[in-house]
């Protein structure tokens, strides 16, 4: 049984809870991360979440997301998860933090997360995605993604839409 780290509104660890339970009944505030990996052309590696994911399945999103395990650091967890989902590792650097709440009306589950945003550079243009996690992937320019999320918002996860509209993602690509 997987557990997530429960946090207070300032992101301080206060306990643990079973993963699915933390996403039920409107969600419990827990620790998470969102990874953005760019290639040398400044394009972002996007993923379409696999149809088998327990919530927000089939939607396009940032490179990967996840939860640190109890006792695991955020950067360590993000680098681990990137390897699990895309088959490569790279050094990740924190650039932002945000709290968000989003309900998946198809499953009745919710995300209520204190999330760290980390960025990195891809060591390859040809990742090896895990098909149980990732239904499709592509490289895309941040400005194209920003326009697409405005025109077709329901194609994207709610946290990714918020980040792509509110954060300087194009600057992260060149930073």
From Swiss-Prot:
Role of this protein: Catalyzes the 1,3-allylic rearrangement of the homoallylic substrate isopentenyl (IPP) to its highly electrophilic allylic isomer, dimethylallyl diphosphate (DMAPP).
Residues spanning the membrane: none
Gene for this chain: idi
GO CC terms in record: cytoplasm
Cofactor note: Binds 1 Mg(2+) ion per subunit. The magnesium ion binds only when substrate is bound. Binds 1 Mn(2+) ion per subunit.
InterPro entries the UniProt entry points to: Idi_bact, IsopentenylPP_isomerase_typ1, NUDIX_hydrolase-like_dom_sf, NUDIX_hydrolase_dom
Organism in which the protein naturally occurs: Halorhodospira halophila (strain DSM 244 / SL1) (Ectothiorhodospira halophila (strain DSM 244 / SL1))
Catalyzed reactions: isopentenyl diphosphate = dimethylallyl diphosphate
Record's protein name: Isopentenyl-diphosphate Delta-isomerase
Similarity comment: Belongs to the IPP isomerase type 1 family.
UniProt keywords, alphabetically: Cytoplasm, Isomerase, Isoprene biosynthesis, Magnesium, Manganese, Metal-binding
């Amino acid at each position: 049984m997987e557990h997530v780290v429960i946090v207070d509104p300032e992101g301080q660890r206060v306990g643990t809870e079973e993963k699915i339970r933390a996403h039920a009944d409107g969600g419990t505030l827990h620790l998470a991360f969102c990874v953005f990996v760019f290639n040398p052309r400044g394009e972002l590696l996007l993923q379409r979440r696999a149809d088998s994911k327990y919530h927000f399945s089939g939607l396009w999103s940032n490179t990967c997301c996840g939860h640190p395990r109890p006792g695991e650091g955020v950067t360590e967890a993000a680098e681990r998860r990137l390897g699990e989902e895309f088959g490569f590792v790279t050094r990740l650097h924190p650039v932002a933090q945000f709290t968000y709440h989003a309900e998946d009306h198809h499953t009745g589950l919710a995300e209520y997360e204190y999330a760290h945003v980390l960025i990195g550079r891809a060591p390859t243009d040809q990742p090896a995605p895990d098909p149980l996690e990732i239904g499709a992937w592509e490289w895309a320019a941040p400005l194209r993604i920003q326009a697409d999320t405005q025109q077709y918002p329901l194609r994207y996860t709610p946290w990714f839409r918020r980040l792509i509209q509110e954060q300087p993602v194009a600057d992260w690509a060149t930073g």
